[in-house]
Amino acid sequence: MKKSARPYICTFIIALCTSCSVSKFIPEDKYLLDEVRIVSETKEVKPSLFNSYIRQNPNAKWFNLVKIPMRTYCVSGVDSTKWINRFFRKIGDAPVIYDESVALKSQEEIEKAVRNMGYMGATVHLDKKTKKNKLKLAYRIHAGHPYRVRHVVYDIDDLVISDYMRQDSAQSLLAPGMLFDVNVLDTERQRITKLLQNKGYYKFNKDFLVYQADTARNTYLVDLTLRLLPYQRRKEDLPRKHRQYKVGEVNFLADDEIMSVQEGTLEEFDSLRYKGYSMYYKGKAFLRPQVLVDFNRIRPGELYSEQDVQNTYSNLGRLRALKYSNIRFREVNGENGTQLDAYVFLAKNKNKSMAFEVEGTNSAGDLGAAASVSFQHRNVFKGSETFMMKVRGAYEAITGLGVASQDYVNDNYMEYGIESSLNFPQFMFPFLSSNFKKKIRATSEVGLKFTSQVRPEFSRTLASASWSYKWTDRKRMQHRLDLVDVNYVYMPRKSSAFQEYLDSMSLRNSALKASYENQLVVRTGYSFTYNSAGNAMMRTPTKNSYSIRANIEEAGNLLYVASKLVHPNPKDGEDYVLANIPFAQYVKADFDFAKNFMIDPRNSFVFHIGVGVAYPYGNSKMLPFEKRYFSGGANSVRGWSVRSLGPGVYKGSEDGRMDFINQAGDIKLDLNIEYRTHLFWKLNGAAFVDAGNIWTIRDDSGQEGGLFKFNEFYKQIAVAYGLGIRFDLDYLILRFDGGMKAINPVETGKKRYPVIRPRFSRDFAFHFAVGYPF
């Protein structure tokens, strides 16, 4: 079957790569637009700045090399009534036929854009080169001599506004010697407008700021004047001075029925007065007044500030009890002049919801089922606190227990658990001032979880409790503080056969035995994420960007001190315990950096480095299994399946049993480069090269060759290469990656370099994941 398919595959590839079939779609006396370039004679005028002005681009190339979409389209025949031809045309890309009128419009827009940069005499010429029925087009920019600002004069006939601008002059974008750049001039108008709107000038906009430019004779110098126009609502109105507004009354309208009423009819509804604010509602208020006051930034008696309005929107958007909010202002005459009364309309969200999930499971051929039901309340204490509870149960029929099955109480796997969390929309901690809680945009969460697992070999109970905080700042940084996170593992039962197996494996696999012991982990951690493109972790950025993620955590130090005080001298070889439970003690740090280079709107290049180090000490000789690093998988070195690489040159056990336990380490290094390209429709492609491995800090007989050594670790770095397909569904990205081993540090000689003689069955690994790897 495979042999018979080869001729068809070869024929299709040849059809895609040959160009003769393109000509039948090119009309007579027309040309295929083969290439478009922008060329600039001036170093300061970068061609990449004008890509957005190109109205007609050539057919897209996969990986910037081959026009596969166009070739696919050209495989179709001329007869569009045949379904096969329609299919190829639908998935392909029709040849782009050069249009002179469109090119002239692009030429005009590029020329205008260059002149707006300060090159007033700039010209753009079209350079066309034809060969047979193909055309290559170049937009050649002749920028000429730039115009620069000689003097800057401010004509501001308003002492208050003039004083505000003088105080903020250090932030001004205007300065003698600058290019006469129209874009910068407009940005300065927007900056001043934003400044004044935050100083009470509610009706101010940038159109009240105009420039006057005078060019000195026979020079490339410009004398610039920035003038303030008086306020004039309509042409027929008399000009007047710009009015500065203060906030009068602030009213919260917390009911769906009030959303559609006029301000003058609010007396029909229930109301209360709280700390100078008015609340209107019908029946019972669904939010406490204190919550609304804390999340509001619009203060009575203060100057109007657009920034305060936006901050209020942002704060209210964090309240899950609200569907949406709307803020309106009404101009009124107060005792101290013109004021703005604020009306904050609040639409109530649905408080309660339930969800039920059923899933099938297949663990190494053992079939089972799982079900869960969850409940959520978004406004438990009328402060937009979110309570969640989830109950889960699972069952799996286990086969292949072998001769030891007579020692087992059953041949099934059962799991049941319950988890709950309570989320507060503020930083909840005793002794903190209310001002601090208002400034930091944080959420607090308390969580509890209990899980019971019953297998033929053992029974295990897992319990956890956590108290954490999350907050963001305006610098695109997200923070998380795990104040305390307690995890307890209890093994009430082990079958005699399973215990004998663990004892027999303890010498060559100490990590395996440690994974089935009672254990207590009490940790504290902090992590942050910064993304220069904003909250764009899932989507492809539209410009060069980078992201940084870092994490640090420690566990067991307080318990160690407490245990030392209670039992200062334990017996030799024994660990410190709390209530007869040994606890873990370690410190762990991770750093992750990714840089995205945009080549053009369809192609980008991404570089990533990830480093992690964890050190067990004191009461622990080994990290808890869930805190150890592993390599291989969809987000690591993709030529290896998950948890199948390392540590170091560790080859695994002879029988391969429980290798995933041993293939974990204390140090991790990941290096990745990835070329991403848009293919067609919602499909994107990627070509990647990955490198990395994991290592242990201490030598372990069960992980031979896994110890980290400065003079050897670089020789143990594994390398993989591969291709990937990404299906962009807008709300999520489905990723399919196929990796091949290039350098396998475990092997020696020629086998160490499978890239030279690849074998698909030995070197290939397939991965499915959601979202980008970095």
Predicted segments, located by residue:
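Gram-negative/organellar outer-membrane beta-barrel architecture
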Residues: 164, 285-286, 305-549, 638-639, ...
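C-terminal motif of bacterial Sec signal peptides marking the signal peptidase cleavage site
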Residues: 17-19
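A generic beta-sheet turn/junction motif
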Residues: 132, 554, 600, 727-731
